[in-house]
Amino acid sequence: FFILYKKTKVTFFSDSAYLCDMSKQNSPLVLGTERISKLLTQYAIPAIIAMTASSLYNMADSIFIGHGVGPLAISGLALTFPLMNLAAAFGSLVGVGASTLVSVKLGQKDYEGANKVLGNVLVLNVVLGLAFTLVFMLLLDPILYFFGASENTISYARDYMNVILIGNVITHMYLGLNAVLRSSGFPKLAMYATLASVVINCVLNPLFIFGFGWGIKGSAWATVISQVISLTGQLIHFSRPKELLHFKKGIYRLKSEIVKGILYIGMSPFLMNLCACLIVILINRGLKEHGGDMAIGAYGIVNRVVFLFIMILSLIHISEPTRLQLI
């Protein structure tokens, strides 16, 4: 990730006196000059590749847990899906809203405003991440039982989520900054951050599960550690003063207009993810009643396979215009 970062250099269009002062910075502003069709390909394909890689990891994660811990652990892992998806929903709430606001500010040439959005994203993710962690750590067992856990699977789901919740703030920051990274003109760098997380995860998973004998907790720790490493790369990027968007004094105070804008724009993807959580909860409860723990585990595996094929089809679809241009 860090090596690929150094290779991700993009030029930007010249503007007024402000850009003269920013001439040494390498944050791209080609969004204002490049063809929309080309930008669509440049931004959509890296995003879908990253999501496809994440789907592949989720399948590998299930394989490691299934062979290293057992089938009931797969069922316990499946029970955590609504909680994981809910955490992702909060990540989308901030990430989608912030990335849109950053794009708008850059389009308006309000670069100071874009930096304030970056600072608000960091603080807002920490606040929401801590609140999410506190609430669900206090109510974890009742929530898991409501999701369809049984006496046979509750320990696996609890062990996994306890570790994930410890690193939940990291997850929120990672998702939020990756969205801003993409919208500020670095779609490939955002993809590299995700791919780095996936690769590290796949390396640590078998080491922690089979090598150290940590069981399902090992898989959770692999997830948290991989996100910490990717987040470190993002923080290094935004800490570089030569970048157009970078951390500096005066951008971390929450502004009501920025927070409202982020939440308003991000509410739609948040509600979509929330609905997906509710659907999975209802299905898991029905499967527990009529099929038992193994049925919940089987449904969790099917979910991962289906999502992988959705990502592959999306990648084929978005690359179609490019292939037509080549013809």
Go through each PLM region and give its residues.
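Signature of the first transmembrane helix
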Residues: 38-99, 103, 267-287
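Generic alpha-helical transmembrane segments of integral inner-membrane proteins
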Residues: 48, 52, 56, 60, ...
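Alpha-helical transmembrane segments of multi-pass membrane transporters/permeases
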Residues: 125, 180-203, 217, 221-224
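Small-residue-rich hydrophobic transmembrane alpha-helices
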Residues: 74-134, 171-190, 299-324
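Hydrophobic residues within alpha-helical transmembrane segments
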Residues: 45, 49, 83, 123, ...
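Short alpha-helical transmembrane segments in multi-pass integral membrane proteins
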Residues: 2-44, 102-169, 211-266, 320-324
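Helix-terminus/linker motif at the lipid-water interface of multi-pass membrane proteins
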Residues: 56-75, 144-151, 207-213, 277-308
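Hydrophobic/aromatic residues within transmembrane alpha-helices of membrane transport systems
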Residues: 49, 61-65, 77, 102, ...
